[in-house]
Amino acid sequence: MAKLTKPKTEGILHKGQSLYEYLDARVLTSKPFGAAGDATTDDTEVIAASLNSQKAVTISDGVFSSSGINSNYCNLDGRGSGVLSHRSSTGNYLVFNNPRTGRLSNITVESNKATDTTQGQQVSLAGGSDVTVSDVNFSNVKGTGFSLIAYPNDAPPDGLMIKGIRGSYSGYATNKAAGCVLADSSVNSLIDNVIAKNYPQFGAVELKGTASYNIVSNVIGADCQHVTYNGTEGPIAPSNNLIKGVMANNPKYAAVVAGKGSTNLISDVLVDYSTSDARQAHGVTVEGSDNVINNVLMSGCDGTNSLGQRQTATIARFIGTANNNYASVFPSYSATGVITFESGSTRNFVEVKHPGRRNDLLSSASTIDGAATIDGTSNSNVVHAPALGQYIGSMSGRFEWRIKSMSLPSGVLTSADKYRMLGDGAVSLAVGGGTSSQVRLFTSDGTSRTVSLTNGNVRLSTSSTGYLQLGADAMTPDSTGTYALGSASRAWSGGFTQAAFTVTSDARCKTEPLTISDALLDAWSEVDFVQFQYLDRVEEKGADSARWHFGIIAQRAKEAFERHGIDAHRYGFLCFDSWDDVYEEDANGSRKLITPAGSRYGIRYEEVLILEAALMRRTIKRMQEALAALPK
């Protein structure tokens, strides 16, 4: 071991003291005490000895040039201005083997790799626990490898605190295997406040292997291929990690690669592609399962990248077998793409919290790529865009608003108790379910009616049990003789049929037939046939345009029968109907009178014509009998 000479500064070392004796006394590596720090002199031995002293080592001002250093201890502090510069153009630089506690802080680590393809890591934590790496600046970064890497060595890295990391990469090339920070299989660790510029494939922070129970937060990636990257190289992928606060400034591909891992929570991601040359612009790509990606805001995509080339934009992309993932996104850009479900992705749910410039997620230029994966089965992907009123897909194959139970109060419901679907346009509603499905409609007082499809027939309920049925060849009531077509207050204006109506005349449906009595015919003989105009038609068209009709007056027929002591209401030819006021409730709960109370007489002409025919028969018969009684 070389002997240190006494420094020129006031005595701390003694002449003839060895380096280790000095370090044991002081543990200070600086220009006056053995390390040159002039960017030229090889300070490898001094730095290595300082680390191996197991004491805290301070790197003072200067550039300390050294070859690769391998130590079991990590206790270096640079006071903010110290620089460790790699003398070698290849290989790893600072390697710490299974350090237990310790720190690397307030220092710049300079790489001097020979080419853009030279392999090597700047700082390596090979295993270890409870180590802090803080306020470290990585400069002159190029080649392949990582600025800071933590990986297993007998056991995975545990309890690392990595914060305040800056790195700037030169020699960018797409998919070059390089990145700023890599935590391979680390557990229970914190990576916070990372600023990375121009890093290729693995971006600012990569979690890899069995990495779990880590927090990655407050990461800025400028012009990186990706910003945070969950390793997808092998079958084992990170799980149970929290990644939050990601700023992606013009990434070259995807801002966040959630990878093949599971149960990771990724939140608060801001992505801008305004000046990016990316041909593929993705906010988040997901390949694993049971991950939550919350609050992704993406901007700067208009369909063309900074080089004028066509750019495909997708804020959430589900790859391969992505399953059971959730994402909430804000696509604040004009490019059409929003969501991609690749073949094989299942049960993923995307909530579009605001659609940006889009008014439809299923337009002709569909913003959902892979919409065929939304099939309404238990494996269906689902997209909700509440601002657009679009709820696309269901994993249950149905849409439900379900409550445990419902009981109606004795009084009417208030407006707050109602469920309404309002709109100026057409409303389409499809409900599926076996051979029968129905929609039930409620009024504010609890009355309900249903519209149903049963065995291919459409049914409109008229009461709790009654209905009108529209079948393939007929419109029928639920039972015979229970409904009328029109009413006294709402009569049909007319009608058209190809054949006359068929009226039931089966003897099995009638009482014992009786002959029409002379008293009835005598009363009927006093009812005159007249011509008339309807008053509402005169009011609408004028007396000169309203048409004339032929018939009888119901009240005159009633009076004629009364003169003969007969109650005409006992007979089916005379009708009398009355009704109360009819109100309609609008969307605000206000009642509006639509039909005032009233009454109206009516005539069944087929029956009075039978009376007229019977009267004529009697008259003719009597004339024939009178003629027959005349002398021959």
Curated annotation (Swiss-Prot):
Residues 505-630 form the Peptidase S74 domain. The lineage of its organism: Viruses, Duplodnaviria, Heunggongvirae, Uroviricota, Caudoviricetes. The keyword Lyase applies. The keyword Ribonucleoprotein does not apply. This is Tail spike protein. The record marks S505, D506 as: Cleavage. It is an enzyme of class 4 (lyase). It holds the Pfam family Peptidase_S74. Changing Y229A: 98% loss ofof enzymatic activity. Changing E206A: Complete loss of enzymatic activity. Keywords: Degradation of host capsule during virus entry, Degradation of host cell envelope components during virus entry, Lyase, Viral tail fiber protein, Viral tail protein, Virion, Virus entry into host cell. It comes from Escherichia virus K5 (Bacteriophage K5). Gene3D superfamilies: Single-stranded right-handed beta-helix, Pectin lyase-like, Winged helix-like DNA-binding domain superfamily/Winged helix DNA-binding domain. Its EC number is 4.-.-.-. GO terms for molecular function: lyase activity. PROSITE patterns: ICA. InterPro entries: Pectin_lyas_fold, Pectin_lyase_fold/virulence, S74_ICA, WH-like_DNA-bd_sf. Changing K208 to A/M/R: Complete loss of enzymatic activity. GO terms for cellular component: virus tail, fiber.
